[in-house]
Amino acid sequence: MASEDQSAARSTGKVNWFNASKGYGFITPDDGSVELFVHQSSIVSEGYRSLTVGDAVEFAITQGSDGKTKAVNVTAPGGGSLKKENNSRGNGARRGGGGSGCYNCGELGHISKDCGIGGGGGGGERRSRGGEGCYNCGDTGHFARDCTSAGNGDQRGATKGGNDGCYTCGDVGHVARDCTQKSVGNGDQRGAVKGGNDGCYTCGDVGHFARDCTQKVAAGNVRSGGGGSGTCYSCGGVGHIARDCATKRQPSRGCYQCGGSGHLARDCDQRGSGGGGNDNACYKCGKEGHFARECSSVA
């Protein structure tokens, strides 16, 4: 306190807010001047140094090195020591005992999530958390997951642009995985207005995938909006892929030696007759009819 200019005059006021766990609070002077910061170390108390919202106190005003005024030498009216047995008892029951009460209303006996007062609260309502009501109906006392009201026009859940409704049917109160209308494709349902991207690629209906489709029909009666991406590469049909195709096309790649099919160039008995010249000769001995790895010549 040596660096602070302390006034000899003392003032009176009431505690506006105090948090024992943080060790500071605010006092509102009786003369109507600006509220003053008070630190726990400035409290003169018999026992626990704490203040209770609504406590009448007497104090001196100082100006610290930071240029801000604050209350020091805080006592009971008349200059006596404050009597605080512990941090959860006191004269008032609003922010009882400096921070142990409800952060919403300041009362003891419950915490803010169980508070029945939405956004109200004792002398420190500017610090109250408020706005913690149900996101579905806007009421306090419960969360959206426990809300029994769903879908009314005046409810908060109905003002979110419909983002909380079921993605299949568009109704609220359930999610798509619990929807019983998975196979209905009416125009007023959300699942049917997605540009058809969620339907079966074989028949175009919604509610199942192409692999589960029972309408394995020929081309022309099926959806082909994918530019042929759903057709079989083997036979050109739709409804299956090449590995499941029952029609196996002859391989287009034949023998590189003679141009025939049914064998590879290394097994071709017409080596040398394909116009390859010396390209088909052994690199070791220069003779045709075999490769270097099969050559028996040691020269």
Swiss-Prot record:
Main localization of the protein described in the UniProt heading: nucleus
Q: List the disulfide bonds.
A: none
Which residues are recorded as modified (N-acetylalanine)?
A2
Q: Which protein is depicted?
A: Cold shock protein 1
Q: Which family does it belong to?
A: Belongs to the cold shock protein (CSP) family.
ZnF (CCHC-type) intervals:
100-117, 132-149, 164-181, 198-215, 230-247, 253-270, 280-297
Please name the taxonomic classification of the source: Eukaryota, Viridiplantae, Streptophyta, Embryophyta, Tracheophyta
Which intervals hold domain CSD?
12-76
Q: Which GO terms describe its cellular component?
A: cytoplasm; nucleus; plasma membrane
SMART domains, alphabetized: CSP, ZnF_C2HC
* Keyword Hydrolase (UniProt): no
What induces or represses its expression, per the UniProt entry? Answer: Accumulates during cold acclimation, but down-regulated by dehydration and salt stresses.
The protein's UniProt keywords, in alphabetical order, are:
Acetylation, Chaperone, Cytoplasm, DNA-binding, Metal-binding, Nucleus, Repeat, RNA-binding, Zinc, Zinc-finger
Please describe what this protein does.
Chaperone that binds to RNA, single- (ssDNA) and double-stranded (dsDNA) DNA, and unwinds nucleic acid duplex. Exhibits a DNA melting activity. May be involved in cold resistance. Prevents seed germination under dehydration or salt stress conditions.
What's the name of its gene? CSP1
